[in-house]
Amino acid sequence: MKKIVVNGIDFFKNQDLSNTTFKKCNIIDNIVEINSNETYFQPTKEDTFRPEGNTWEIGVKVKASGFTSNSQVLFGSNTAGKFYLMPSVEIQSTGALWAGISQNGTSWDLSISSEKQIPLNVWCYIKYIYDKTNYTVLLSTDNLNWETYISLEGSIIANCTSNLEFGGIALSGNHYAINTKFDLNNIYIKVNDSLIWGNKED
């Protein structure tokens, strides 16, 4: 695949990360290591993810080397103290996945934890999907065989009035994804099955 260069970093040509803010990110071979609450990346445009009731999918490829006492947020709202302004997925201290969705913007209208832990030291593909009927979080270690970790029934419309941030929620203090690495070749946002930001592996 042909590659392009953005800010001195090579990306695959179908990757749209030109409108991306990288904050104190150490990037080697497209891998971002999260080592503090000041390390994160996000779409620069404030209106990148505004699905307004359409179907959507948010995906990451992540490897966790350990669990922490605080939640390791994979993505969520970047507004300080306002966790409810974007869909969020995190790794809890137990290693379980957690997902939340808010319509009122002040609390989680729907939230649930998985019964299974995610595997450590293994690259995991994780995607959060809304199909207008259910919110589903799936996990795969090979991008082929998927397991449902979380399923939430509900057709509420997510608040989505902040900016989506990956690698934790740096502006909220301790909710960041320390002990994790993200592969930028599979970080993406889709709305109505169209890729609107990032890159999705085939």
Language model segments and positions:
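A carbohydrate-recognition surface predominantly in extracellular/luminal proteins
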Residues: 47-66, 83-87, 185-187
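Short surface loop/edge beta-strand patches of beta-sandwich-type extracellular domains
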Residues: 35-56, 111-117, 174-176
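Short carbohydrate-recognition loop motifs
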Residues: 23-39, 98
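Flexible glycan-contacting loops in extracellular carbohydrate-active proteins
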Residues: 150-183
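Localized edge beta-strand/strand-to-loop motifs within extracellular or lumenal beta-rich domains
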Residues: 122-136
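Extended recognition patches within non-cytosolic domains
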Residues: 2-9, 14-30, 183-202
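Short, aromatic/His-centered strand-loop micro-motif at the edge of beta-sheets
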Residues: 101-125
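Glycan-recognition/cleft segments
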Residues: 72-101
